[in-house]
Amino acid sequence: MRKVMLAEKAGFCFGVKRAVDMALLTQKEYNKKIYTLGELIHNNDVVDKLKDNNVYPIGIEDIDNLKENDVILIRSHGISEEIYKILLSKGLTVINATCPFVTKIQEKVKKYNELGYDIVIVGDKYHPEVIGINGWCDNKAIISKQGENLENITSESKVCIVSQTTEKLENWEKVLKEVKNRAIEVISFNTICNATSERQKIAKDLSNKVDFMVVIGGKQSSNTTKLYEICKSNCNETIHVENSGEIPENILKNKNCVIGVTAGASTPDWIIEEAISKMSENQISNETNNEMADAMKFIAENEGKIYVGASVTGEIIQVSEKEVFLNINYKRDGVIPKSEIDDDGKDLKELFTVGDKIVAKIIKLKDADNYVVLSVKELQREQGYKEIKEAFENKTTLNVVVKEDVKGGIIASYKGIRIFIPASHVELFHVDNLKEYIGKSFDVAIIEYSTKKRQTKIVASRRALLSKEKEKVEETVWNKLEEGQVVEGEVKRLTDFGAFVEIEGVDGLLHVSEISWGRVEKPADVLKIGDKIKVYVLSVDKENKKLSLSVKKLTENPWNNVEEKYPVGSVVLGKVIRFADFGAFVKLEPGVDGLVHISEISHKRIAKPSDALNVGEEIKAKILEVSSEEKKIGLSIREVEE
């Protein structure tokens, strides 16, 4: 039984399809004969179909015969800079259908040629694409197919190397290796089109599995010829045909074989389908997908659906470093620049895959390269405004990312929409450095959403959410706090009258008098912000949200049994800790101080305590009196002096 297997990625590539669509569109717009500089693509059947639609190829020698305002279309292979300037100087209407990937190569060689680099092009020197590229570097490029013509490159050469988009990868690697062996400074751009390399790999794999391999495409088509060479190296029974009429009888009569089919980038679907149908012994249906008819049908059916602001669904047909190209079922393909997709610098080839469907918003009907310009960001923004308004009306939250700090607050982003957050709404406390929040994401509540003179003002608050969260936490903590509990807290603030200690989000006051049994002048003398300390809960006032704490309650009152510890008449050692006009205070133990009256300091008459004593001095004194109720101990230094 005969089996026909069609390779994936066979047929029209992105650049070729774009050129054909542009030719048909241009003819429709101008409604007169349109000229293409050279055959638009290397496929005789397509060229004939274009002629049927009043699109005719001419040679460079025919340019002088054109009249002002005649319309000429540059084919997908591109042309030299010199010829491009000639077309413009003649007053012609020039439509540039150069494949965008070829245009980028032209830009690269022009740039590096002007920077003094030797340009090397890997490819066929007679191919129109290579001729055109060479024309953008003053026709000075070294053209090498398999490593030849590189004799003038030396170790002192600065080289920029690019490739014909349809070149075989093995040729690129061979020439690149040779260039790097000769020159030290080499800038290389592998400009082989992804579609080309994928098509070649798939064709190579398929040719290993079949009895016959049929490669369909124009005999002048470079990429088709390379497909033939690749397949022929694996399958000896490989043939190159332009259409179904060239398929030989030995294949058609073989009833028991597997036939592989691939096609060059210039081969439309309807030619491929004719060939498959013939080899499969099926009649061609009247509903055969005709590439030309489809293109014209899309022009008619979708004209009214494409306008700035409309949302469209497209199928990804190509992904480059800077753009994503879509088939949007319209006379022009769509393009999404990277700037309209993502701000985070991600690789587009990691985000998108050829064949995926994507929805985007139209922001321009036609750019310089004749694409419909689309934006994912604008679609997200449109949806974002709806979600922000709903969040404002329903009092729900949104997660935003902080982008920059501005006067009076910060700017956050939600789906590309700027949202202002006042500085006073960032935290529950004052923030000195708002730059610390750049790049951070958090939930916010929308507190203002208004539109005036076509401008939308959006203000959000994080503090409102933090306040609600704090209230919930505090409510739980207040319900479990009781007098007499011992809990752990963190010192958050210090004042002259005490320290504020946070316990699971609730602030309590540790009064200066409750820090120690001894005298504390200032809380900062014994505590610092951030200290983790255990505290005793003195009182809990849930209604007024007041919490009183104590540290000294965690230790025994040193005045208990003081009469037994310090009997009257005993002599003790102590340290002078401070002076008063009437005497000196002496520390006997933590929390217990005694007073030496000025009259009990010395046998000599002194005007003030500091005349005889120094703060920090160790002294010996006699206990004159003790009162635990009044917390007083009277001392005398004079009575122990000899």
Curated annotation (Swiss-Prot):
It is an enzyme of class 1 (oxidoreductase). Pfam families: LYTB, S1. Keywords: 4Fe-4S, Iron, Iron-sulfur, Isoprene biosynthesis, Metal-binding, Oxidoreductase. CDD domains: lytB_ispH, S1_RPS1_repeat_ec1_hs1, S1_RPS1_repeat_ec2_hs2, S1_RPS1_repeat_ec3. [4Fe-4S] cluster binds at residues 13, 99, 193. It comes from the Bacteria. GO terms for biological process: dimethylallyl diphosphate biosynthetic process; isopentenyl diphosphate biosynthetic process, methylerythritol 4-phosphate pathway; terpenoid biosynthetic process. SUPFAM superfamilies: Nucleic acid-binding proteins (SSF50249). The keyword Oxidoreductase applies. Catalyzes the conversion of 1-hydroxy-2-methyl-2-(E)-butenyl 4-diphosphate (HMBPP) into a mixture of isopentenyl diphosphate (IPP) and dimethylallyl diphosphate (DMAPP). Acts in the terminal step of the DOXP/MEP pathway for isoprenoid precursor biosynthesis. In the N-terminal section; belongs to the IspH family. NCBIfam families: ispH_lytB, PRK00087.1, PRK01045.1-1, PRK06676.1, PRK12360.1. This is 4-hydroxy-3-methylbut-2-enyl diphosphate reductase.
